């Protein structure tokens, strides 16, 4: 049987990330980004093989951008497209696995929008546009939260009145599940272990970051919570702060809830600490030039990351290794070294040459000889979404 092609779509409020995934090949035949949708500057950019190109699509919405994309996808797939996988950020407690999309599922995703007001409505825009343009193809939703539905109750419940959970779904959900699942499977493969008999601490580090405790292929704890704001220091998100900060700022500065939410999500994290940038690459360069804010932001980021990994270890029966992934995790030897240095009680130590070598897509072990595994594994959420989609077509 010839190998199958899946189009993977990830829709933001004004963007669409897309990748054509062939089950038999590691490289994407076609991938790209439509951005600034709804504006005069809307543009579609793509790469096919070694070639890059772009097309201005003024005022295009999600449907118009996907319509422009359709002939490119069909051409790159040789006329054989077998399904479409959609990334959906929040599935609440309703979805524990990838799910074939139909009217009932779409309404259930819509019902979870209050849990992810910035993400789920945008995801739905893409789903509805794609289902209109590709009516004859199977469509599958893959949820960021689904992998974490295996968390035990003592890990996902907040110490709040029970009615808030029972009536309003206030609990920890976790995110980046597709990435954590993908890299934990790759880690077991690299280590020669069975997925069902392995335990990992995973750190997905990018503009959004989270840690995860993974035992026998299941998530048992994770750092993000009800929303992606909980947990680690991130690019522009604060991560954990005193829960009373909202009332303190409202009382002393007169800030509204909207102003506080915007500050915590868009003005904090690495950007807030450094007063410079949310980009770790920029901060590392400025740190070398003696910028105190950049140095502080990196120190806080790594210390908080190490604290979270240590906390996640409570869910593990043994430690088979620590995984670094995501844009920062895959490309910052400095962050990996500083984080591991804080975890000396775990007897972790890095091989400096191996750590320096694992950047720009290079995977591998970076631990010193005789010490517990530390692995750098490039994530591939698009391939995992495609595999989940294919599994429902079999």
UniProtKB/Swiss-Prot annotation:
An annotated GO BP: acetate metabolic process
Record: active site: 144
EC number(s) reported in the record: 2.7.2.1
Residues involved in ATP binding: 17, 204-208, 279-281, 327-331
Keywords (A to Z) from UniProt: ATP-binding, Cytoplasm, Kinase, Magnesium, Metal-binding, Nucleotide-binding, Transferase
Signal peptide: none
Subcellular location: Cytoplasm
Chief place where the protein resides: cytoplasm
Positions of the record's site feature: Transition state stabilizer: 176, 237
Subunit details: Homodimer.
Name of the protein described by the UniProt record: Acetate kinase
């Amino acid at each position: 049987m010839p190998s199958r092609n899946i189009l993977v779509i990830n829709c933001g409020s004004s963007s669409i990330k897309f990748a054509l995934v062939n089950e038999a090949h590691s490289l994407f035949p076609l991938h790209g980004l439509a951005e600034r949708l709804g504006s005069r500057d809307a543009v579609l950019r793509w790469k096919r093989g070694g070639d890059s190109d772009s097309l201005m699509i003024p005022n295009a919405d999600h449907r118009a951008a996907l319509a422009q994309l359709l002939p490119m996808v069909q051409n790159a797939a040789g006329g054989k497209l077998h399904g479409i996988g959609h990334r959906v950020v929040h599935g609440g407690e309703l979805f524990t696995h990838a799910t074939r999309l139909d009217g009932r599922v779409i309404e259930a995703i819509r019902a979870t929008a209050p849990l992810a007001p910035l993400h789920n409505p945008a995801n739905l825009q893409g789903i509805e546009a794609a289902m209109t343009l590709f009516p004859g193809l199977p469509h599958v939703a893959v949820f960021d939260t689904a992998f974490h539905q295996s968390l035990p109750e003592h890990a996902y419940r907040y110490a709040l009145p029970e009615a808030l959970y029972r009536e309003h779904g206030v609990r920890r959900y976790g995110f980046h599940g597709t990435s954590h699942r993908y890299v934990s499977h790759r880690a077991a493969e690299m280590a020669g272990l069975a997925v069902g008999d392995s335990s990992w601490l995973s750190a997905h580090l990018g503009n959004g970051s989270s840690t995860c405790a993974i035992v026998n292929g299941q998530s048992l704890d994770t750092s993000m919570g009800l929303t992606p704001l909980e947990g680690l220091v991130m690019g522009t998100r604060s991560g954990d702060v005193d829960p009373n900060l909202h009332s303190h700022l409202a009382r002393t500065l007169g800030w509204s809830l909207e102003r506080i939410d915007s500050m915590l999500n868009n003005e904090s994290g690495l950007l807030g600490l450094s007063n410079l940038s949310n980009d770790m690459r920029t901060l590392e360069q400025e740190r070398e030039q003696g910028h105190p804010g950049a140095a502080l932001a990196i120190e806080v980021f790594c210390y908080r990351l190490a604290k979270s990994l240590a906390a996640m270890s409570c869910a593990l029966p043994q430690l088979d290794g620590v995984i670094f992934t995501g844009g920062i995790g895959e490309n910052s030897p400095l962050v990996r070294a500083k984080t591991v240095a804080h975890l000396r009680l775990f007897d972790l130590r890095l091989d400096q040459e191996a750590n320096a070598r694992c950047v720009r897509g290079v995977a591998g072990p970076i631990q010193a000889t005789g010490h517990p595994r530390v692995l750098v594994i490039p994530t591939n959420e698009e391939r995992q979404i495609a595999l989940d989609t294919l599994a429902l077509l079999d």
